Amino acid sequence: MQSKLHVDKVITTVNSPSAAAHSPLAASWRRSATRHGHDPSDSRVAERLGQTDVECHRERLERFIRVATPRLDLLFGLVGLSGCGVFLTDDAGLVLDRRVADGDAAAFDGWGLGIGADWSEASEGTNGIGTCIAEMRRVTIHRDEHFFVRNIGMSCLDAPIFGPDGGLLAALDVSSARVDQTGAYNRLIGAMVAQAAQAIEADFFRASFPDARIVVADSDNIDGSVLLAVDGDDLIVGATRGARRTFGLEQKGALKLRPASDVLGRADGPVGFEKAERAAVIRALARAEGNVSKAARGLGIGRATLYRRMKRLGIGE
């Protein structure tokens, strides 16, 4: 009876001329039916790739998965005892890594949440992973919000993870089949998922620019890290998706070279040759703890030359 009611509700919503315009969930249901040709009563289980194919996909994201692993372990430590599983997918919704308790593994396998399973909307209709990827935002798909009737026993909470190029890289999912999982509990877990996804994004960004100075910028953006990678010449060489949006930079791909001081609106960066030279001399003196001879050696110039530059630049000994 519940199955029939769900199918009828989905079909009615899909056929409504206005529902999709007023509800993101209804819009996803319509995509599932009209764009992907799904029938909500379809009972087939999600398809899974073989181990060899999965390894090929994992190799493409090997460095990212290695960076993400500690955060996945930490998240599972927080939610695993409550019957939840933690899943990491690529940008196409393919499950590449998961954390589930031994006692829950069979249940998640039965739901089709195994390594190599395709949980894109094209494969599974409206669901946490696929809809998160399709809309590139945090989503919660609770039980009968799923498109397929076979998935209405689950609650899925997801957040996207964006790469250093600003493009979608992966999705982080926590799923549960507990019948007593409430909306309040979902909000709590959803906040944990979002925080973990943001931490993974920041960790991978830092790992992608090991020789750069990472600037954490102030922003009201709560959906992603706002980080800039700045090289030794004060040029921005990398920016997270949140930083790209905050500072009006290129949304994806390579960045046009810009001084960080221009973007951050600071007047104390090395703007102009004289200012850059003055900053370099002051840094050298600071490193030498005020010893002019040592500072001169660090700059590769003579002591007398450094004195002349200090006088010209208005730097007291």
Regions picked out by a protein language model, each given a short descriptive name:
Residues 1-123, 127-148, 153-154, 162-165, ...:
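Intrinsically disordered, low-complexity terminal regulatory regions
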Residues 104, 108, 247-254:
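PAS/PAS-like sensory domain cap-loop motif
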Residues 257-258:
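C-terminal structured domains
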Residues 262-276:
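Short, Lys/Arg-enriched anionic-surface-contact patches
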Residues 273-317:
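Bacterial C-terminal helix-turn-helix
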